[in-house]
Amino acid sequence: MLTQVDGLKEKGFWDTLANRLYYALFHAVSAMLICDGREVGSHKGAAIRFHQFYVKTGLFTIEEGSFYSQMETLREKADYNCYFDVTEAEILERIAPTLQLIEKIEQYISDKGY
């Protein structure tokens, strides 16, 4: 999914880019939950568990938890709201934080020995 970022930026496919960034983040969060023996049944469930087990315990910041929730909302609007288009500015400012959060999750998983 992340291999598509540059191509989608070049083409100006902001809605699709929001989708890909969110799903990359969702899959990272899901992998972390699974590695810790927690079930992932839905997008909302993953978000709730991320906040419950990682944000509230201080492993991830409140800002990171909020960012994850914002990315889910942005993706839902981009995918399902016919009257909403993600702007270039909205998505470009979210690329680096998404990649940073994924890297932090990958490090957490790696530190656990997976």
Predicted regions and their residues:
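Terminal alpha-helical segments
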Residues: 1-114
